[in-house]
Amino acid sequence: MEKIIECVPNFSTSDPKVLDLLKACFKKHGVLIGYECDIDHNRAVITCAGNPKKVIKAVLQAVGVAVQNIDLNTHTGAHPRMGAVDVIPFIPVKNMTMQEAVEVSKIVGSKISKKFDVPVFL
């Protein structure tokens, strides 16, 4: 039975060029569902869902894009933020438990920390 997980990462940007790069990460893996962008908050929210391995790959690629292209030293916006990527919630959709979604979040957090040398709060 195929497992499906949803993820809704929040990025601290409203730059159309960066948003296109971020969306491309999810399109490449066939998991992009939609996105919202708010200029006043300088924030983009992407919704993706699919096979957990594909979602993980897309999220990690998008975090790399965010780390390279979002500079919080010059960031403005009404929304409070902690990083280029603020939150990466995982939601079990089909044939997955909440505990499995939590495990996915721990795997992703560990990979982000190691690959990009940034702090991760779980």
Please place each PLM-identified region on the residue numbering.
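Long, contiguous binding/interaction regions
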Residues: 1-122
